[in-house]
Every structure is written in C-alpha cells, then in structure tokens.
Amino acid sequence: MTLQLPNDPARSDVLSARPTLWINSLYRDDAIGDTCLPLVPDQVDVAQSDWERLAPLLETCFPELKKTAGAIRSDLTELHALREALGYGGGEFGRVFAKADSALPVAGSIKARGGVYEVFVFAEELARREGLIGDREDIRHLASAEARAFFSSYSIAVGSTGNLGLSVGVAARALGFEATVHMSSDAKPWKVERLRKLGVKVVQHEADYTTAVENARSAAEDDPAVYFVDDEQSRRLFLGYSVAASELVDQLQTFGVAVDADRPLFLYLPCGIGGAPGGVTYGAKKVFGDNAHCFFVEPVQSPCALVHMMSGSEELVSVYDVGLTNSTEADGMAVARMSAFVATVMRNMLAGVFTVDDASLFRWLLLAHEVQGLRLEPSAAAGFAGPGFIVKHPQGRAFCERLKLSDRLRQATHVVWTTGGSFVPQEQFDQFLEIAQASRSR
C-alpha cells in the first residue's frame, strides 16, 4: 500500500530519509492514567516483585549475577568528557548521562530485561502448574537436574533481528528448554553463531524482521509444547523492560539528581518494534510522572514508530508504505512495522521520535569508545542525538516552549539509553571502528 503522510514539519525530512525530529501532537499529561489502555501501572509493581522472587534462581543460573544477588542491572554514567565531544558542553544542555544497558549481564543488551524475564516467568508458571514446585519450595529448584529434564520436553520460540533472540536463547538454554530463534536477513552472523554454540536452533529467513516473527508464530502455534515469545504483542516482555525505570530512580538520586517540574528528565530510547523503549517509557511515566519526557530514536530508513504515529492510521503502517527501504547497519532497529500493542500504549505517552543516519551512528560509536570507553554496537549509539534535537532543533525548541520547559533546560537531565554492544566480538567491534575512522578521514 502507498500512504500519504499528513502535513507536518517533519514530513519532508522523513520522506527524504533525512535526520529529523517529530513531535507527537497527542502527547498529554497523565497519559498513563488512561483507563482504556490494555494494562495498568500496578502491573509494573508485579513485574518488580517477579524479578525479586526470581533473583535467587537467576543467580544460580548465571554466576555473573552473584555480585548483584541475581539482579540484572546496568550502570548510570555521567558523560562529562563525551558531552563536550558531542557538542553538548554548554550549560543549556543540563546534565547528560548514559544508561549502559549495552553492558547488561547475561545477554549484553536491553533485551535481557524483557527476554530473560519472560522466559523465567513462563518457566515458573509452567513448573507450578505441573506440580514441579510447590508454593513454599525454593525457587532454585528450577535449576535442578530434575527441572532441566522436565523443561527439556518444551521449546521456546522467538523471531528476532538478533538481540532478543540472544536474550531468549540464553535464558531458555540456562533452564534446559529447547530453543528456536527465527532470524531476519538483517541479523549479524556473530549473533547467529553465538546462539548455535549455546545449542539454540537458528532458522534464518531471507526476509525482514516482520516476516521472521510471522514465521516463528506460525511454526509455534500448532504445537502445545512450544511457547512463543511474541515481540509484537507480549505484555510480559513490555513489563520486564518497564522495571528499569525504578532502577534509574535510585541511580539518579546517587548523583544528586532530582526530577520534578523545575528539573525535567529527557530519555532517549533506540526503537525497533517498540517493546523495549515502550516498556521503559511506561515505567518512567509511572515513577517520574509528567516530569519525564521520552523520545524514541530510529534510523532514517526504518522509522516505523514515527511513520505509524505520524500517520494517525488505525491500521499499522510500514516504512515501505512511504517509500523507505528499511535498510540500516543498526540491525536491532531494522523493523518496518511497529507493534500495535506498543502503538496503542504510546499514543498519548510518547513525546516524539527523532531519526538518525548510519554515518552518525558510527561517528558516535567511535567517540563513545575513544572518549568515554564505551563499547557499543551502532544501534546503541542512536540516542546521542537527543540533547541536540531538544535544545537546538526548531521542533525541539517549540516543544520546550509549549511545555514551558525552555527556562528549565539548564536544570534538566538527559539520559541516553545505550542498548547493546558488550557481547560484540572484538573482530566485529574493530570493523565498526574502522568504518567510523574511514568516514572521519574523508
């Protein structure tokens, strides 16, 4: 189908695949309180309780979690030097931080928050339903030989461009499940190889992410022994991500950062299908209220959330419908059509979306490594454009004027969510750096 986007200041840039900022005209206060939404804020608290209950089991399955007592957490780092290198040294940029999910244990990306959560919650649910574990029994029994033998007769399936597949595959194999990951043509070879070394069956499709998910769903739906992790519709994935915002509250307090009407918080979240950034946004709105303003960031050729939300269509819109290619080196964001579930939840909750080109991703990846010592994959560097768009772009300035934030930007906090990279093999990371250095020397 061919789609005509409505008249909007960002329209021309979007259609021409130029970096731009789109502001959501439907963004409003207290959107999380909308009773028509398909979930309620209390479900974030339930997810937090799930994580705490599962922590002893996670620590048993993953020795790297011993130092956090089974919690999957990432550091918050203030970017003193990198902000200067990025051109954000002026006082009008407030304080700039990175939330380093790029170094999350277990799976090395933000997808550990969703994929591990869903697999482990399902495992507990299945074990209790089948009488493998009682209400008062130690949750660590699910890591026993008996439990592994039980789980081995079940399989977990998922469709992925890479990082969600890694997260689900690692979690499933840790408990003894069989696992199948359907991967799109955008998936990086090293991610495929890593999964296969874990004993995960990888089915590669010569098609995009949406097709890989559809094939995974179709293959799973007729087999009662297969549990499908549905990246397009899963509440569990979404809620697993949402708990990250509570983690951020404590970390900001450690830096002496308060978030209130006079000290706004801006979050910049790389977006593929939308589950991870949508979950973090929902959690942020729960804990910070209307003082948090969340922006998705997408590649110029794959802005699926921007295109759909700008269109105002009740039907899902694809980037192909507006003549874009869905071609990008940011494999985790190479998604043509956003999640309908996430689109519904974000309708009034998301402040906006900005887009970036691949050359900028590599430039920021190199700067982050040289100046801050961060190890990122291209998609994880996307959020670094955020402060510039808010403070300098005409639409960013208009947004701040409309919300009466312009005079408060010096007290603002910007958090760039770096979403993956620590598991990238050294050879592949060196190639990223070479691409960036070659571009710099031109």
From Swiss-Prot:
EC number: 4.3.1.18
Family: Belongs to the serine/threonine dehydratase family. DsdA subfamily.
Catalysed reactions listed for this entry: D-serine = pyruvate + NH4(+)
Keyword Methyltransferase: no
Gene name of the encoded protein: dsdA
UniProt-listed InterPro entries: D_Ser_am_lyase, Ser/Thr_Dehydratase, TrpB-like_PALP, TrpB-like_PALP_sf
Residues that bear N6-(pyridoxal phosphate)lysine: K111
EC main group: lyase
Lineage: superkingdom: Bacteria
Entry GO MF terms: D-serine ammonia-lyase activity; hydro-lyase activity; pyridoxal phosphate binding
Name by which UniProt lists this protein: Probable D-serine dehydratase
Alphabetical list of Pfam families matching this protein: PALP
Required cofactor names: pyridoxal 5'-phosphate
Biological process per Gene Ontology, one example term: isoleucine biosynthetic process
Keywords: Lyase, Pyridoxal phosphate
